[in-house]
A protein has these predicted regions:
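Phosphodiester-processing cores and adjacent nucleic acid-binding clamps
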Residues: 1-234
């Protein structure tokens, strides 16, 4: 349920809430927007030791909450910074003893859903200008994207590792990466209950009052909310 105290751009939890309800929870360090990545982005200009020290502090905190249910997450894509982050995570894992997993950063349940969404999202920028970070050379096919954000099996994960590590020119320990892929399998099959991604579209069912069309009522509540927020900011 919604709680305004746990909302920052999207629903979230803080460390206190995680600590309170951590029993049985398995956490990974996430993608280039994750907690280890935060250390990387904030400290990379200061050098390797600054990044690692921040990651040590994060690791100590997460392990104190989750124990062996905290994992360093490696990902395989064409983003150069991902491979820099991977190297830092591997170093922290060797130093602290946390286990590693390899993932696809699965934002979408199927390749088809990913394909449709990624192309729609990027080509959509053409009609309304682009943010500064977006390359002028917008992709026209999924082959031009630098990642595949959907679940893969073990063989596909290994193929992604080989492909993207070669493109990045980064030498990894094959045995270590293989173990991280196998660890993902162990979590999926041995540590959690079975579930299957549900890609059905779910839209909220809004009751439109009598005398309004859906568009009219949306316009009304949007206007009322805007004026309410403006008053709060006075």
């Amino acid at each position: 349920s919604y709680n305004g105290d746990y909302f920052y751009r999207k629903p979230r939890i803080d460390y206190a809430l995680l600590n309170k309800y951590s029993s049985g929870v398995i956490c990974l360090s996430a993608c280039l927007g994750g907690v280890y990545a935060g250390c990387y982005w904030a400290n990379r200009e200061e050098g390797e030791e600054a990044v690692l020290q921040c990651m040590r502090e994060v690791t100590e905190r997460m392990v104190s909450i989750l124990g062996d249910r905290w994992y360093g997450e490696l990902q395989w894509n064409g983003v150069p910074e991902q491979h820099e982050l991977n190297q830092y995570i591997i170093k922290i894992a060797k130093e602290t003893g946390i286990k590693l997993v390899s993932t696809c950063d699965s934002h979408y349940p199927t390749p088809v859903a990913w394909t449709d969404r990624e192309l729609y999202k990027r080509l959509g920028w053409l009609g309304r200008g682009k943010p500064e970070w977006l390359d002028m050379n917008l992709p026209t096919s999924v082959q031009e994207l630098e990642y595949e954000l959907y679940p893969k099996n073990g063989d596909q994960m290994w193929e992604s590792y080989i492909k993207y590590s070669k493109e990045a020119g980064v030498d990894y320990d094959d045995d270590l990466v293989l173990q991280s892929i196998e660890e993902s399998h162990r979590i999926a099959f041995d540590r959690i209950e079975r579930f299957y991604p549900d890609d059905t579209v779910r839209l909220p069912d809004f009751v439109v009052p009598a005398g309004y069309t859906a568009d009219d009522y949306l316009r009304r509540i949007a206007s009322e909310s805007l004026f309410s927020m403006l008053k709060q900011n006075d």
